[in-house]
Regions:
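Active-site scaffold of zinc-dependent metalloenzymes
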Residues: 143-145, 212-237, 286-288
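Zn2+-dependent metallopeptidase catalytic core
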Residues: 152-192, 339, 348
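Acidic/polar low-complexity surface segments
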Residues: 9-10, 316, 354-386
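Catalytic zinc-binding patch centered on the HExxH motif and its immediate surroundings
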Residues: 202-222, 269-273, 277
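Active-site recognition of the HExxH zinc-binding catalytic motif
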Residues: 243-258
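Short, well-structured beta-strand/strand-turn elements
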Residues: 176-196, 209-217, 233-234, 256-261
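Disordered inhibitory propeptide/activation segment of secreted metzincin zinc metalloprotease zymogens
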Residues: 104-163
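Acidic, glycine-rich calcium-binding repeat modules characteristic of RTX/beta-roll
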Residues: 1, 6-102, 158-159, 232-245, ...
């Protein structure tokens, strides 16, 4: 069962919660808190504490002092803003908040890709935004005629004006588009007073075109206000207002700015890490302030899609057939898929490639990866996508499967094929090939 354990006394304490959902509060000295199994809450309070939630999605707050956290689940959430803290991370692709000074990956764990990490605020750690929706995957939305009663921010009511029919139509078009990209649905509601509810309204803003809140456990989460300037009256394609609309919805879904410098027009600093150089551009993320008119439409850019699919997963109704994704050598390849039996095809590239069909990995055409994922010939599969098959080029490739049953064909060249998990069929093709089935009952064919 669940346990509530409090140790206010001084002296080092080693506390185990055992099975069940535990609430453990340490004392005023250095404690060692172990949640063990279950969904646990651990508070270290004072001292240099060790916190290990164990199995399950755990909340850990070391309090003051130099604390050590053990993270073993992608849903483990750390809240600690003081001291010099360390996290030992034994599972891959975890969002670690930037206020943890030292991160050590163990057990072969891999860090979250920088192009996703840079668009997620600290509040997104522990997959918090996804957990707010639960299994329904549903956001609600409302166009209030007055400032909602729960909103105590007086500035939100300054010049308050409800959305016009044109603004409503464009907003609903944006939401329909988003539901075709990520695994959420949007339902209109008659009341703004609810959790996971987007509020859309106009007001007077002195230095910004719009403002939005991240998702949260309070009703103010995901509320969006737009300046009453004329350009925002239509959110028309080809106008900056269209970019403003999709940008603010990005915030309301959980995306942050990618830049590390103060911006004119109210753009605040975001949590590190950051995108730099050419990647801090709306060509790659609509959350950037470095914009061009090519992005003045109701569409996310590639890095936005990658980050949002990390949070919510890809739409299960889009790209739902048996799709073939042909890799380009002259553009980056951000691959995502909703359903079906799908193939990544390297037959069109002019040199060997390294490809991982497990989401989150960084593949590339050529002998080595580029400096940035947005460079030509880079290859990655977005989180939540399942690709079953992989076809190599006419050159020497390194091809890696995933945990499903894969069909991997090397083609010409001296290839390396690795099935990873699942019951895989590996076909080397002509050339001196090396085949490794990995975990599962695998079949290898040589020519």
């Amino acid at each position: 069962g669940s346990a509530y354990i409090f140790y206010p006394a001084t002296g080092i304490k080693k506390i185990h919660g055992g099975n069940g959902n535990d609430f453990i509060v340490g004392g005023s000295s250095s404690d060692e808190l172990f949640g063990d199994a279950g969904i646990d809450t651990l508070y270290g309070r004072n001292g240099n504490d060790i916190l290990d939630g164990g199995e399950g999605a755990d909340y850990m707050d070391g309090g003051s002092g130099n604390d050590i956290y053990y993270v073993s689940d992608i849903y483990d959430l750390i809240d600690d803003t003081s001291g010099n803290d360390t996290a030992y991370v034994s599972t891959s692709f975890v969002k670690i908040p930037s206020f943890i000074e030292k991160v050590i990956y163990t057990n072969g764990a891999i860090a979250l890709p920088y192009w996703v990490d840079a668009l997620l605020p600290n509040e997104a750690s522990g997959n918090y935004f996804d957990t707010l929706l639960g299994s329904s995957n549903t956001f609600y939305y409302n166009f209030p005629i007055a400032l909602p009663s729960y909103d105590t921010n007086a500035s939100h009511g300054y010049g308050f004006k409800t959305f016009s029919s044109v603004q409503i139509a464009r907003t609903e078009a944006a939401l329909n588009y988003i539901a075709s990209v990520i695994d959420v649905q949007f339902k209109k509601t008659i009341s703004a007073n609810g959790l996971n509810t987007f509020v859309f309204a106009n007001n007077n803003q002195s230095s910004s075109a719009g403002s939005a809140n991240y998702p949260s456990a309070s009703m103010i989460g995901s509320d969006i206000y737009f300046d009453t300037s004329a350009i925002n009256s239509k959110f028309a394609d080809g106008s900056y207002a269209a970019l403003t609309l999709i940008h603010e919805i990005g915030h309301a879904l959980g995306l942050e700015h990618p830049f590390s410098y103060a911006q004119a027009g109210g753009g605040g600093l975001s949590d590190p890490p950051y995108l730099t150089g050419a990647e801090d551009s709306t060509a790659w993320t609509v959350m950037s302030y470095e914009d061009t008119s090519a992005q003045y439409y109701l569409n996310f850019s590639p890095l936005d899609t990658a980050a949002l699919q990390y949070i919510y997963g890809p739409s299960k109704t889009a790209r739902a057939g048996n799709d073939i994704y042909k890799v380009s050598s002259t553009a980056p390849n951000f691959i995502w898929d909703g359903a079906g039996t799908d193939t990544i095809d390297l037959s069109g590239v002019n040199q060997g490639a390294t490809v991982f069909i497990t989401p989150g990995y960084w593949g590339f055409v050529g002998s080595q990866k580029a400096a940035t994922i947005t460079s030509s010939g880079q290859i990655t599969v977005n989180f939540g996508s399942i690709i079953e098959n992989l076809t190599g080029s006419s050159f020497a490739d390194k091809l890696y499967g995933n945990d499903t049953d894969n069909y991997i064909v090397g083609g010409l060249g001296n290839d390396w094929l690795d099935g990873w998990g699942g019951n895989d069929l590996l076909i080397g093709g002509p050339g001196d090939d090396e085949l490794n089935g990995g975990v599962g009952i695998d079949t290898a064919q040589f020519e």
